[in-house]
Amino acid sequence: MAFLKLTEQNVQGKTVLIRADMNVPFKDGKISDDTRIRASLASIKYCVDNGASVIVMTHLGRPTEGEFHPEDDVAPVAAHLGSLLGKDVKVLNDWRENKPALNAGDVVMLQNVRINKGEKKNDLELGKAYASLCDVFVNDAFGTAHRAQASTEAVAQAAPVACAGVLMAGELDALGKALKQPARPMVAIVAGSKVSTKLTILESLADKVDQLIVGGGIANTFLLAEGKAIGKSLAEHDLVEESKKIMAKMAAKGGSVPLPTDVVVAKAFAADAEAVVKDIADVAEDEMILDIGPKSAAALADLLKAAGTVVWNGPVGVFEFDQFAGGTKALAEAIAQSKAFSIAGGGDTLAAIAKFGVTEQIGYISTGGGAFLEFLEGKELPAVAALEKRGA
């Protein structure tokens, strides 16, 4: 991927417009998790340390375009950013009428981009209005890269220079390393409740990987495709044929979809449900599979430890309940111990990584939920394509 990087630009004396993703959650009117704000600091600090003035823009929540309500206000985000930077970060509400006059080291924030008419439709005039504020545009919002919007795509077309921020560049470099030139063998874990939501990812990865590990409800559908009884487990009977095709595709190239030989079952989906380990052949009609068994976990752990590249999306069991967390824990620890380059993404995956304390041992943790999944699907990300076009 050829794109310009912020860290390669001379920004001294320039105004830099950074599209960040600071769409943080709130609880009782206060920011409950500032991870996304902290993730944006590297690009902002690079600009400030190198003599630039900075304009930050972000979306917050899901406001109606053309309307402004108190909950849409980015002021609490700006205040928190200011406290992290040790600076006063003002919010600009009327930036189209009054272009800000900034000095080197200043940091300001535009009001919520999603209240601007034309933002979601990728309006070129709005993109030009954003671009008119800056000498250099920086996209550092990988989480929104799969959407073509005025603050991510149109602005990149119109700005004098368009480049990737520290976070965006790191994300794209890691994804490129994992998917474009992977060290072999390459192993992917794709887990979740439904094959239907991950079908295109499964099909795309089946072309790339040497082993395709499936988990959760997805694994149950594959077990059905192998003719196994799964009791009352969650599965999609209408996707059994698609599952067979994916297994055949993997087998034809000498790979496989290794399915569990033992599982952890329960009679109910509940935090206090009794967990029983069973051979896959012994699952009863009134039981549901809620995790992979210890033998299966050990076999998959060996695959992961011998891998050159690991892509992880989704826990293989109901890890929120400790009695069904063993499989996901074993795989998380195997990835942590592996010499493979590992990349993980998706909300549940990140929660599992945090729960089992292996954050530091994962090669790269992706910040972009939907964008990460679309990259795995092999889709073009509009905001990234815009940067590549400008970097060519």
Curated annotation (Swiss-Prot):
Family matches, as Gene3D superfamilies: Phosphoglycerate kinase, N-terminal domain
Keyword annotations of the record: ATP-binding, Cytoplasm, Glycolysis, Kinase, Nucleotide-binding, Transferase
Chief location: cytoplasm
GO BP terms: gluconeogenesis; glycolytic process
Binding site for ATP: K198, E320, G346, G347, D348, T349
Catalyzed reaction equations: (2R)-3-phosphoglycerate + ATP = (2R)-3-phospho-glyceroyl phosphate + ADP
This protein's pathway: Carbohydrate degradation; glycolysis; pyruvate from D-glyceraldehyde 3-phosphate: step 2/5
Top enzyme class: transferase
Gene Ontology, cellular component aspect: cytosol
Location in or out of the cell: Cytoplasm
GO function terms (MF aspect): ADP binding; ATP binding; phosphoglycerate kinase activity
Keyword Manganese: no
Keyword Lyase attributed: no
Binding site for substrate: D21, M22, N23, R36, H59, L60, G61, R62, R114, R147
Source species, domain of life: Bacteria
The EC number(s) this enzyme carries: 2.7.2.3
Family: Belongs to the phosphoglycerate kinase family.
PANTHER family associated with the record: PHOSPHOGLYCERATE KINASE, PHOSPHOGLYCERATE KINASE 1, CHLOROPLASTIC-RELATED
Quaternary structure annotation from Swiss-Prot or TrEMBL: Monomer.
Protein name: Phosphoglycerate kinase
Source species of the chain: Neisseria meningitidis serogroup B (strain ATCC BAA-335 / MC58)
GN (gene name): pgk
